[in-house]
Amino acid sequence: MALFTLFSLLGCSQLATKPNSDKPSLEQSKASAEDSLFNRMGGLPTIKTVVSETIDEVSSNRKTSRSFKDIKLPKLKESVVSQICKLTGGGCEYDGETMLNSHKDAKISTAEFELFVAVFRESLSRHTNTREKNELLKILAPMKRDIVTTQ
């Protein structure tokens, strides 16, 4: 199984609302979409680059390569990109497995997970700002409990 199978466009269909309404105005919705983590990171080009660099490196690293045996790397990359896109507000659909289901038999150790995260962080640092990197890592961090299945 893959080490990390790592995401709904903010609605801009709201019409202007009453000043005391809880619903955002059209202008507020557009501003929210423009300010999404997805957009601040650089959108799909950045996400695709980071995911590709990370998976290429960890799938060929002797410490983690066993986790990628028999995995179709292009499909994995596509799935991880979709998941990150959705989680960051990019409007992509993610229809892949849950982290728990996709990693339950993989026997991923804490050391393997930490190596993956280190490579991912390095790639994020090369392609996005610290604020965005940290926001994304905070979103993804809870997945560790579903990915790490052995010590």
Model regions and ranges:
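Sec-dependent signal peptide recognition
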Residues: M1-L3
